[in-house]
């Protein structure tokens, strides 16, 4: 039994989020939540919400026992970027890309 939760369009870059995802891949959910709780990174809070959602999906939809669950897969995909301009000297402008990503977490036995 595998249950997944997806967060689409998270407003943080995929590169920064993958650093957090690599730390919890394959861990039991209780240890993964512990790692995410004490991580100082912004991405840890976002990934933690997705992991909690996947746990709730497994418990509610499949009637799974939380103690037996582990993170079977977690992957981060790049999403659409927001294009913005910032003013520079002499009437010029520079383009800024605000990155976003899709977070997919799968939990199972």
Swiss-Prot record:
Gene of this entry: rplV
Keyword flag Lipid biosynthesis: no
Name of this protein: Large ribosomal subunit protein uL22
Keywords assigned: Ribonucleoprotein, Ribosomal protein, RNA-binding, rRNA-binding
Gene Ontology molecular function, alphabetical: rRNA binding; structural constituent of ribosome
GO biological process: translation
Organism: Paraburkholderia xenovorans (strain LB400)
Assembly and interaction partners: Part of the 50S ribosomal subunit.
Database matches in HAMAP family: Ribosomal_uL22_B
Any single Pfam family the record assigns to this protein: Ribosomal_L22
